[in-house]
Amino acid sequence: MDIASLSAKSCNECSTKLSKFSHAEAAHYLTLLPDWQLADEKLTRAVKVKDFAQALKLANRIGAIAEQENHHPDLLVKWGLLGITIYTHSVNGLTENDFILAAKINNLID
């Protein structure tokens, strides 16, 4: 699998029936996503931007993707920076949905 095929997928409905990834599975998928890190069973990325307005604009664009996929990241909007944290709340860890959303966000940013 590559990032293009990952970003072409759609997120599955979130529920406790989703399979939480093992650390090895998460580490494998992470190799497809440059600029993302694993932290406490969550995907994180910090995106440097020009100013607060650009961070807010990017947050809104990510929000539109999140609504379309019905999978929502935690966003931290700061002057010159947008922090993104993704995980599946229902399993309190990572699932394929998180990596699909991250790939779609990468397409938007990169």
Task: For each feature predicted by the language model, list its residue ranges.
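Long, contiguous binding/interaction regions
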Residues: 1-110
